[in-house]
Design a protein with these regions (language model features):
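Short, basic, helix/turn surface patches
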Residues: 136-143, 207-213
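Short, conserved glycine- and acidic-residue-centered signature motifs
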Residues: 159, 163
Length: 282
């Protein structure tokens, strides 16, 4: 769909306006493109033989803030946790949301190109989401908590999933000096944009990651446990709690799983003696 000299600064406003007013003649090619992207997302999540895939370094994982976790991804971990059905559904919904939002961007008059374009740096491949109005864009579905980091610009100081390094890879490959996140709040339906104006050096990052992956032993743990004040025990922080390799990674101290308000809390087993009188569940 040909853009009408739109700028990405008005993208969210224009999508909202489209949803308010609708359009009598949606572009049929764009509709088919959205449908094809959704079908591919469903096929990939439901029928791709993930257990048979050989793990490889990609743009989407070299930005992981924990190279130790990535080492286990590449070199194997017999105790690694498989993705739960809920997690797979969450990933699928993220792909479907991406296809829908990019369609809405087109219908709102913005130029959307290079969807799922493959790029490569130093042998590491990746597929970017899109380029909108000439700007590199990565669509993210997020929680209300995560949304705040995009809205107030604090993502650079709190990026547990390596979004900026991933964006930097795409930007470096395309010769861009910035990249824009188009974030969607899964709870409220709100959209916002955040532009990262400083991209990291992907080639340097790739070199360091490749060196780490070739080691016989995994790199040191980059994250320390945090103190749970109410239990007076040490527990895993956010990054480690969500990691599929936490059992192996913390085997030297062991983990003590408890639940608080229905949510798992991973205490260090060796810290149990610090508070023997605490209740086992919260």
């Amino acid at each position: 769909m040909k853009a009408n000299d739109k700028q990405i600064d008005t993208l969210v406003e224009d999508i909202y306006s489209l949803l308010d007013n609708g359009t009598k003649n949606p572009d049929r090619g764009s509709l088919y493109g959205m449908a094809a992207a959704m079908m591919e997302a469903v096929r990939r999540q439901l029928w791709s033989p993930t257990s048979e895939r050989k793990p490889t370094l990609r743009m989407s994982n070299i930005g992981k803030p924990c190279t130790r976790s990535l080492w286990y991804d590449m070199n194997g971990d017999e105790q690694a946790e498989n993705f739960s059905p809920q997690t797979r559904l969450k990933f699928l919904m993220g792909d479907l949301v991406e296809a829908l939002i990019l369609f809405l961007a087109k219908e709102a008059g913005h130029e959307v190109t290079d969807q799922q374009k493959e790029v490569q740096i130093d042998g590491i491949k990746g597929h970017l989401d899109a380029v909108i109005d000439g700007q590199l864009v990565d669509v993210k579905s997020t929680s209300s908590y995560g949304m705040r980091k995009f809205k107030d610009g604090t993502l650079p100081s709190d990026d547990p999933f390596g979004y900026i390094d991933q964006m930097s890879g795409y930007g470096n490959a395309l010769g861009k000096d910035s990249g824009t996140f188009l974030a969607f709040d899964k709870s409220s339906g709100e959209l916002t944009t955040y532009t990262q104006t400083e991209l990291s050096d992907t080639s340097q990052r790739i070199g360091l990651v490749k060196q780490a992956m070739e080691r016989v032993d995994p790199p040191d743990r980059p994250f320390e446990p945090v103190l749970d004040k109410s239990a007076r025990r040490k527990k895993l922080g956010v990054n480690c709690s969500y990691c599929s390799h936490k059992t192996t990674c913390w085997a030297d101290v062991g983990l003590d799983l408890k639940f608080r308000s229905g949510r798992p809390v991973f205490f260090l087993a060796k810290s149990k003696s610090e508070s023997q009188n605490n209740a086992e569940t919260f």
